[in-house]
């Protein structure tokens, strides 16, 4: 399993609510269109300030952590080739320009290691 992680920042002037609304009602569907048949999971995780008392939401370097899981390198390569096609790029870039600060986009593939944790008792 290969995971692609992308850190994305909303375009200046776009509120957090507007950003999430557009991503979840429009941009997500573009992603699903080009990832279908290649990816096994596609998630968006919207960042919030963990210590709101000492940090303003505007201090976050990114607004969303996007994760895409592929069953292997061939599936990821095929998806990336499709996404790189001229017709896909026209659609994707046009929407990204409405939504993201494109200069700040960062993508990484990651190796995951998971720890099994003991069960937490209810009410803890």
Label the predicted regions.
Residues 1-124:
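Macromolecular interaction modules
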């Amino acid at each position: 399993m290969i995971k692609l992680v992308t850190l994305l920042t909303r375009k200046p002037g776009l509120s957090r609510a507007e950003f999430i609304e557009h991503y979840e009602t429009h941009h997500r569907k573009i992603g699903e269109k080009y990832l279908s048949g290649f990816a096994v999971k596609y998630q968006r995780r919207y960042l919030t300030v963990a210590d709101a008392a000492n940090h303003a939401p505007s201090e976050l370097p990114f607004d969303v952590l996007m994760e895409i899981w592929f069953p292997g390198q061939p599936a990821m390569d095929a998806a990336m080739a499709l996404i790189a096609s001229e017709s896909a790029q026209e659609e994707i870039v046009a929407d990204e320009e409405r939504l993201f600060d494109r200069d700040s986009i960062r993508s990484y593939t990651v190796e995951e290691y998971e720890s099994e944790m003991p069960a937490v008792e209810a009410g803890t």
